[in-house]
Amino acid sequence: MEIIGYYESPNQQELIGKIRACDWSAARFLADLLEKGTFDETLGGWGYLFLLLDGENLISFATLTGQDAVRDESLTPWIGFVFTNPEYRGHRYAGKVLAHAEKMAAKLGYGRVYLETNHVGLYEKYGYVYLENRIDCWGEDARVLYKELEEVE
């Protein structure tokens, strides 16, 4: 198993296909952003997409971006689009991708990351703390969580 960066991969079209095949509407939205080249523009001007692969199989993925569905420029960066394929759930693979994104955020000089979700208890087990509820860009209520990051040399 390995975590790769989408933008460093020579197989971007293949990865878009794997993301689009996930049974989650947000994954299809992410695939559209990548295909149209609007990922950075839509998500705060910059971003990373990390994918955990087992050979050719997509296990899990997450993004690290300047903005997410909760629009507030004072809160940055965001981890989003966190997904683990159902057949791989229960093994904490999302935690591996989260940790990778968190490490990148720390390398970029950030001391905290944010995440918005409707799940209760899922991200808390990875050290995330509830901040508050906010209305997202679709007008829906979302829980905003954060995590303090350790400095990386």
What are the roles of these predicted feature ranges?
Residues 49-51, 57-67, 78, 83:
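Conserved beta-strand in the GNAT
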